[in-house]
């Protein structure tokens, strides 16, 4: 067993002898180097912690209580010749041995009867357990316990020792026990029969006075004054102990040393051949020597109630019958003496063994605690299911060793199924709420914990209620073994967080694991984060309950509903911060990698060293050899992780009738080398070579290639219950597999072979899952069909296959365990690709057309950046092939550049797939690029390639030189086809939706018109502006381009009463324009200023008034969505896709949405808002479209305008409404809705089919081809199930942006912004898997362009990239030097005049806003001036061109600035300062109203504005 325990210690741990412990706590762990990286849309920041310490803490105090129990006998050590061939005691052989003893002269049968009774009770474990306890009590006796000391403290609440151990007293370990001594008596050789209940042991030589004292105390009652774990209470083992010692016994001396205890143990074990008893005792003490110091306040619940330590009844007849002990001892393990020998040589190793054992136990108990009681393996069954060989009691060391086996993934063998030792699972199994007493340290404590008292004061004692036991320890010694997301114990990891600008710096997590990972990495980086649990309302922080760089949210199970909100503005960098987070923007990617591990221990915050020689561990091979021998012994107990295996038979029946009427079918061959999926009306329908209506035959040159076997079969994909072919929505069964009958033995792919037997319905193993199917005989094939209802969340691999089939995105084979289609595709073109690489060349003409709307500032990569600058270049290999195909495709430079850049960016494996696709289609085509991008999503996670690199291939076209079909647009809005749901039904479902939201505490923003309009200069958006009213038209016409927006018009207008707008006719006028997107164009409908203003004010922040499962507004971010989806990880992902959703809404449906909203929230609105909302409701009756390019105007009979203020709101509400009407709430356990996006988790494929059918019945139009069923869980453009969140994003989109800006983007005005944009785009494509070697040269050329554009030297740009933010650079934790980069205006008289003109134009809006601020912030009204507010607001209309210049300062000042960055981030009242800091004349005075001390610091700084920005 010592070999097993040694193997629990990590390789970097090199234990030595002589450990001196003098403190009740020891912190153990490892130092490692952690390289960390943070990326967002603003750039990349890196940092390294060369000496990071990951640790747990253990204490020598614990709440244990020993009880005497009957346990099985340990027979090792008795003479081997009294056992029969089965390993059982034979009383006949016992009698024969006794009859030969010189001590037994008469009445041998009677002695044999006594011996039989005693031998079957033989167990010395408890005696050795107490002696081991005495050894360490003596050795480390100076350890002190103080009842008023803190057991646990996190800054919010603490738990005192006296609260956990109410009856304890201050004491040292040794003084905590005043042990009586049991009677130790010399065995009388003339004793006729054994004395009842008095054990008798053997002893070599004379029992010394110290040994007598040790034995007497070891047999006595332990009644401690202090709760030291090894000194826990235990009853008296025996009132009297006989010792058969030839040389006699000395009277007790009353004193001894720990070395005396070691000598006594050695003598006692060897004399009684009790090595196995000692091993059990050693394991018991390893269980109780130390206890965890919990990682959370709730984890203290594990230790509130005393843990029971089962101590076997002391029973030994060796002293009575020495003849049965000393001759050729029986033992079940050849290594039975190793544990004693190892302990004698290295007694301090028990401490490490104890730490390793309890860590494995509590880590795995953390997992067991989260398992549902209804699961096959749960907290009640995990031990008995892991035991192989015989039943056992679920208690003691068996349970702990089971947990060790589960944690380390190994098999552990024991010679006896003993039940002695500590049973840790009592707290887990009692299933009741546990109350943990705490002392309040922070009055906000109830926000973090489920406290009984909600209003508390500092120092008050209260109680935390715990229902779900969290882990008490984290993996440290077992770090990196069987890693899990839950424990964040990966050597390298990453997490991605979406932060859209609308989120206002708030990240919402719906996945407890992702949330924990985020909090952990932030902690590693040195950032304190506080989050709010949106389900319970409580707060959690990554610094209070956790340490060592890891955070674990433990209040709920994974399956439970979770949601966590993190306000990124409150993230606080610590004094030691390695990667600080400033103004997160867009997608945040946090990652780390750990290397260079070194063990470390601390006691009283000082290093704890072991001196002396290295420990020589027993060879692992010896342990394994012994384990192999044990496996052949019936009486040996084996523990291993439980696994179910089952063998089932295949079967088949016949196909009744095949009617090909609009259904899909597959053409299959018995050889199984090709699958062709087709749709049509009959078998005689013709097709183009290699192409079908639902897909393409990958790698098949012509139809004859299907006949690799002797015959091909037309096999329906879908059948009904009568075996009649149907389309997918009308069928009940779907094809999943076919086997050729010629193969009499069928291999399921997992090493199990089965013979086909001909049963119509049966179970089969398919894709590693057990599936119930019906088999249909079709020629020489057995086709296996599964009922939709039988494809469940317990067969997720099959669900992915069926989902791909239903979506017409089939990329799998059916026959005889085919390869996946992509592997086959790559293999089919292997020779062709090799020839192209080695031989193919192409003369490429570099003169290409410019994209019609491309301006100079849009292009970031040009052809001359990729190839030599000449008219014709000779290309080779894949680039030559792509050039040839591009020339056939189009002649647009931006398209060519994007494809070439994408090819260079692709990793080698995915590059082979892309080139094979190009060869398969013999060129590039908009249609296949789009369809293959869609199919790649369905294949993600089911094939060996990272298909995310092929998502949305069509965006690589990067510019389409075409126009919107405006006539078609007009037809679609005049001859409408909307969903057929009544006004009453829409009202009912939407009221239901908003009532749920209100129950969650969601509310609209309440505001009077005067407040709203006075803030117009800052709250109006900056989008394009239109108006049908002459007053606004005149204003818009004369405004300069920079302020020709809603914000600009509103700011220019004077104060207006609400009736200025409400007196107008309710109507919506939309003005069309063309939006140029990657690979396509679409129509935009920008709506008029009046309808926008009324809608925005009347339904203010309406996007935040949906329930939690509708993440819009501030909740529409990746983190919140992941948290919501966390509860669906065990369900089948189902991404429903609406087809052209805007065009499906009737006017009545849209009006019903507003009516429902007003009816639910009317009491939370002002009268002004209700009036505006009703005006907006009525405006839907009259919708008018203007087409400026044709001059045509027409009335719109329905549908939704894409550019209206309420577009997302309406789409989201009606999204839910239509599907609620289709039964989504009964068919789907959980779903998420946002705009036209839907994500759901379904239990069976049948539920998803029913939802599609029910929705279609009311006229809802869906695009099944874009539905991802069973594979990726895509919602809001992020795959929620991707292991690598960054990899789940789209490389194609990143490359398109890297090469060409969005066409609506403006020319760059500042050098800093341009370089930052280049850096962000570069970092993003690298994060998405682009080749750094191929992309870096292009990135350097972009930086060169920036340098030339702004006429600066090379080192200016280089320093911007590498220097720290404190020095004016773009790098967090970048290089620090005396140089500082400063942004300065490029002198330009035109920009100066334009700025002055804008300031004058917006003066009315600024004046109203200034008055608003003075009214609402009266305490600092004197500091608010119109002039500074004008300057602040004018910055929104940036017209000044800026460059970067060098300046110099003292190096220490730079380091000081970086060191104090964000030091005041948690400053109270900071929100007020942030809101008005740019609009006050005396910033120090403002701060003095909030914090005089900080104001004094600013006053002395010399530059208050700068230092306030640095410090906050």
Swiss-Prot record:
<dbReference type="GO" id="GO:0000166">
    <property type="term" value="F:nucleotide binding"/>
</dbReference>
<keyword id="KW-0378">Hydrolase</keyword>
<dbReference type="InterPro" id="IPR036332">
    <property type="entry name" value="Major_coat_LA-virus_sf"/>
</dbReference>
<dbReference type="GO" id="GO:0016787">
    <property type="term" value="F:hydrolase activity"/>
</dbReference>
<keyword id="KW-0808">Transferase</keyword>
<keyword id="KW-0694">RNA-binding</keyword>
<dbReference type="Pfam" id="PF02123">
    <property type="entry name" value="RdRP_4"/>
</dbReference>
<dbReference type="GO" id="GO:0006351">
    <property type="term" value="P:DNA-templated transcription"/>
</dbReference>
<dbReference type="InterPro" id="IPR001795">
    <property type="entry name" value="RNA-dir_pol_luteovirus"/>
</dbReference>
<dbReference type="GO" id="GO:0003723">
    <property type="term" value="F:RNA binding"/>
</dbReference>
<keyword id="KW-0547">Nucleotide-binding</keyword>
<dbReference type="Pfam" id="PF09220">
    <property type="entry name" value="LA-virus_coat"/>
</dbReference>
<dbReference type="InterPro" id="IPR043502">
    <property type="entry name" value="DNA/RNA_pol_sf"/>
</dbReference>
<keyword id="KW-0548">Nucleotidyltransferase</keyword>
<comment type="function">
    <text>RNA-dependent RNA polymerase which replicates the viral genome. Catalyzes the transcription of fully conservative plus-strand genomic RNAs that are extruded from the virion into the cytoplasm where they function as mRNAs for translation of viral proteins and also as substrates for encapsidation to form new virions. Once encapsidated, the positive strand is converted to dsRNA by the RNA-directed RNA polymerase.</text>
</comment>
<keyword id="KW-0696">RNA-directed RNA polymerase</keyword>
<comment type="similarity">
    <text>Belongs to the totiviridae RNA-directed RNA polymerase family.</text>
</comment>
<dbReference type="GO" id="GO:0075523">
    <property type="term" value="P:viral translational frameshifting"/>
</dbReference>
<dbReference type="InterPro" id="IPR015302">
    <property type="entry name" value="Major_coat_LA-virus"/>
</dbReference>
<dbReference type="GO" id="GO:0003968">
    <property type="term" value="F:RNA-directed RNA polymerase activity"/>
</dbReference>
<protein>
    <recommendedName>
        <fullName>Probable RNA-directed RNA polymerase</fullName>
        <ecNumber>2.7.7.48</ecNumber>
    </recommendedName>
</protein>
<keyword id="KW-0693">Viral RNA replication</keyword>
């Amino acid at each position: 067993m010592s070999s097993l325990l040694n193997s629990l210690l990590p390789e970097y741990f090199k234990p030595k002898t002589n450990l001196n412990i003098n403190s009740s706590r020891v912190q153990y762990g490892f130092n490692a180097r952690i390289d960390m990286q943070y990326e967002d849309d603003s750039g990349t920041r890196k940092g390294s912690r060369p000496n990071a310490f990951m640790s747990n803490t253990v204490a020598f105090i614990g709440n244990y209580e020993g009880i005497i129990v009957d346990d099985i006998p340990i027979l090792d050590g008795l003479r081997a010749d009294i056992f029969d061939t089965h390993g059982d005691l034979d009383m006949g052989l016992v009698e024969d041995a006794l009859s030969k003893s010189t001590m037994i002269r008469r009445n041998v049968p009677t002695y044999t009867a006594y011996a039989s009774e005693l031998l079957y009770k033989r167990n010395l474990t408890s005696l050795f357990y107490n002696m081991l306890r005495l050894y360490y009590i003596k050795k480390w006796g100076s350890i002190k316990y103080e009842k008023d000391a803190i057991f646990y403290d996190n800054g919010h609440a603490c738990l005192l020792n006296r609260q956990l151990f109410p009856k304890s007293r201050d004491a040292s370990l040794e003084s905590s026990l005043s042990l009586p001594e049991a009677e130790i008596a010399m065995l009388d050789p003339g004793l006729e029969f054994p004395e009842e209940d008095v054990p008798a042991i053997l002893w070599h030589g004379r029992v010394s006075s110290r040994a007598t004292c040790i034995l007497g105390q070891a047999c006595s009652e332990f009644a401690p004054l202090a709760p030291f774990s090894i000194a826990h209470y235990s009853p008296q083992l025996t009132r009297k102990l006989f010792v058969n010692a030839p040389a006699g016994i000395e009277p007790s001396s009353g004193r001894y040393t720990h070395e005396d205890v070691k000598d006594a143990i050695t003598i006692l074990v060897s004399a009684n051949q009790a090595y196995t008893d000692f091993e059990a005792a050693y394991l018991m003490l390893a269980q109780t020597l130390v206890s965890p110091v919990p990682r959370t306040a709730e984890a203290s619940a594990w230790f509130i109630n005393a843990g029971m330590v089962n101590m076997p009844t002391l029973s030994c007849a060796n002293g009575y019958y020495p003849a049965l002990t000393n001759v050729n001892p029986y033992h079940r393990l050849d290594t039975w003496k190793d544990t004693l020998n190892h302990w004698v040589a290295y007694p301090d190793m028990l401490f490490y063994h104890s730490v390793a054992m309890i860590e494995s136990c509590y880590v795995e108990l953390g997992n067991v605690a989260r398992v549902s009681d209804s699961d096959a393996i749960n907290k009640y069954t995990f031990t008995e299911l892991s035991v192989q060989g015989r039943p056992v009691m679920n208690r003691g060391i068996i349970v702990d060793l089971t947990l060790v086996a589960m944690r380390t993934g190994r098999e552990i063998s024991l010679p006896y199924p003993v039940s002695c030792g500590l049973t840790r699972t009592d707290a887990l199994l009692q299933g009741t709420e546990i109350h943990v007493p705490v002392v309040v340290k922070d009055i906000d404590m109830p926000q973090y914990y489920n406290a009984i008292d909600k209003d508390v004061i500092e120092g008050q004692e209260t109680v935390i209620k715990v229902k779900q036991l969290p882990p008490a320890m984290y993996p440290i010694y077992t770090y990196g073994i069987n890693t899990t997301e839950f424990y964040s114990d990966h050597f390298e990891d990453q997490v991605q967080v979406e932060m859209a600008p609308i989120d206002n710096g708030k990240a919402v997590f719906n996945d407890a694991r992702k949330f924990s990972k985020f909090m952990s990495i932030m902690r590693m980086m040195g950032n304190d984060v506080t989050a709010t649990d949106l389900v319970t309302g409580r707060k959690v922080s990554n610094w209070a309950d956790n340490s060592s760089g890891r955070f674990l949210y433990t209040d709920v199970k994974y399956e439970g509903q979770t949601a966590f909100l993190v306000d990124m503005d409150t993230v606080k960098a610590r004094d030691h911060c390695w990667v600080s987070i400033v103004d997160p923007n867009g997608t945040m990617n946090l990652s780390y990698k750990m290397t260079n591990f070194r063990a470390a221990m601390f006691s009283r915050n000082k290093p704890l060293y072991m001196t002396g020689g290295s420990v020589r561990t027993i060879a692992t091979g010896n342990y394994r050899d012994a384990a192999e021998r044990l496996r052949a012994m019936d009486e040996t107990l084996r523990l291993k992780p439980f696994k179910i295996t089952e063998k089932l038979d295949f079967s088949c029946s016949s196909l009744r009738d095949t009617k090909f009427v609009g259904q899909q079918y597959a053409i299959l061959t018995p050889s199984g080398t090709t699958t062709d999926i087709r749709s049509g009306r009959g078998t005689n329908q013709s097709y183009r070579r290699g192409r079908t209506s639902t897909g393409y035959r990958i790698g098949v040159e012509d139809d004859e290639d299907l006949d690799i076997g002797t015959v091909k079969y037309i096999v329906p994909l879908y059948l009904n219950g009568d075996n009649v072919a149907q389309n997918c929505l009308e069928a009940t069964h779907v094809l999943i597999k076919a086997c050729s009958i010629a193969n009499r033995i069928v291999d399921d792919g997992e090493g199990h072979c089965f013979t086909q037997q001909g049963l119509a319905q049966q179970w089969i193993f398919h894709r590693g899952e057990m599936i119930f199917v019906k088999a249909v005989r079709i020629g020489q094939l057995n086709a296996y069909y599964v009922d939709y209802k039988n494809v469940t969340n317990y067969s997720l691999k099959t669900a992915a296959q069926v989902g791909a089939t239903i979506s017409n995105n089939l990329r799998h084979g059916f026959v005889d365990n085919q390869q996946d289609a992509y592997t086959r595709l790559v293999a089919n073109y292997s020779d062709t690709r090799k020839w192209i690489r080695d031989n193919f060349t192409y003369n490429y003409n570099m003169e290409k057309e410019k994209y019609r709307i491309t301006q100079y500032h849009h292009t970031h990569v040009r052809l001359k950046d990729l190839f030599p600058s000449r008219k014709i270049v000779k290309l080779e290999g894949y680039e030559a092939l792509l050039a040839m195909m591009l020339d056939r495709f189009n002649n647009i430079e931006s398209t060519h550049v994007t494809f070439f850049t994408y090819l260079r960016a692709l990793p080698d494996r995915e590059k082979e797939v892309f080139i094979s696709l190009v060869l398969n289609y013999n060129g590039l085509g908009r249609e296949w690029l789009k369809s293959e991008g869609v199919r790649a999503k369905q294949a993600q996670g089911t094939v060996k390639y990272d298909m995310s690199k092929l998502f949305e291939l069509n965006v690589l076209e990067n510019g389409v030189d075409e126009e919107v079909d405006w006539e078609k647009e007009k037809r679609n809005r005049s001859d409408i086809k909307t969903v057929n749901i009544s006004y009453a039904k829409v009202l009912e479902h939407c009221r239901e939706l908003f009532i749920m939201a209100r129950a969650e505490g969601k509310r609209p923003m309440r505001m009077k018109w005067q407040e709203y309009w006075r803030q117009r200069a800052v709250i109006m958006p900056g989008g394009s502006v239109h108006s049908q009213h002459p007053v606004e038209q005149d204003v818009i016409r004369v405004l300069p381009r920079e302020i020709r927006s809603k914000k600009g018009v509103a700011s220019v207008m004077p104060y207006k009463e609400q009736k200025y707008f409400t007196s107008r006719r309710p109507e919506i006028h939309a003005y069309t324009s063309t939006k140029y997107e990657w690979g396509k164009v679409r129509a935009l409908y920008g709506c008029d200023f009046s309808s926008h203003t009324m809608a925005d004010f009347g339904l203010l922040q309406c996007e935040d008034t949906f329930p939690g499962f509708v993440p819009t507004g501030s909740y529409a971010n990746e983190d919140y969505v992941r948290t919501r989806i966390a509860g669906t990880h065990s369900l089948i992902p189902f991404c429903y896709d609406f087809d052209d959703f805007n065009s499906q809404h009737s006017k009545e449906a849209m009006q019903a949405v507003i009516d429902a909203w007003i009816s639910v929230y009317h009491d939370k609105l002002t009268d002004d808002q209700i009036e505006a909302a009703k005006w907006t409701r009525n405006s839907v009756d009259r919708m008018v479209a203007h087409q400026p390019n044709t001059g045509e105007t027409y009335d719109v009979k329905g549908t939704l305008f894409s550019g209206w203020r309420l577009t997302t709101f309406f789409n989201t509400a009606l999204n839910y409404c239509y599907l609620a009407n289709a039964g989504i709430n009964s068919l789907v356990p959980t779903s998420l809705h946002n705009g036209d996006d839907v994500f759901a988790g379904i239990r069976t494929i049948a539920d998803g089919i029913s939802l599609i059918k029910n929705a279609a019945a009311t006229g809802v139009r869906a695009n099944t081809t874009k539905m991802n069923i069973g594979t990726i869980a895509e919602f809001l453009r992020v795959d929620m199930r991707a292991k690598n969140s960054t990899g789940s994003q789209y490389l194609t989109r990143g490359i398109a942006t890297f090469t060409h800006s969005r066409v609506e983007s403006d020319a760059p005005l500042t050098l800093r912004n341009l370089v930052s944009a280049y850096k962000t785009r570069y970092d993003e494509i690298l994060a998405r898997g682009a080749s750094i070697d191929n992309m870096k040269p292009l990135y350097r050329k972009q930086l060169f362009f920036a340098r030339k554009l702004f006429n600066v030297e090379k080192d200016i740009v280089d320093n911007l990239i590498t220097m720290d933010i404190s020095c004016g650079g773009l790098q967090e934790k970048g290089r620090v030097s005396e140089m500082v980069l400063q942004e300065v205006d490029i002198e330009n008289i035109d920009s100066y005049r334009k700025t002055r003109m804008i300031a004058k134009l917006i003066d009315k809006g600024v004046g109203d806003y200034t008055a608003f601020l003075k009214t609402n912030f009266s305490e600092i009204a004197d500091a608010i001036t119109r002039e500074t507010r004008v300057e602040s607001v004018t910055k929104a209309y940036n017209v000044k061109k800026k460059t970067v210049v060098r300046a110099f300062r003292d190096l220490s000042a730079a380091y000081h600035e970086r060191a104090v960055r964000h030091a005041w981030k948690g400053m109270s009242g900071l929100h007020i300062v942030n809101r008005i800091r740019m609009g006050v004349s005396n910033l120090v005075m403002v701060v003095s109203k909030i914090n005089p001390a900080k104001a004094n610091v600013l006053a002395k700084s010399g530059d208050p504005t700068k230092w306030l920005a640095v410090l906050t």
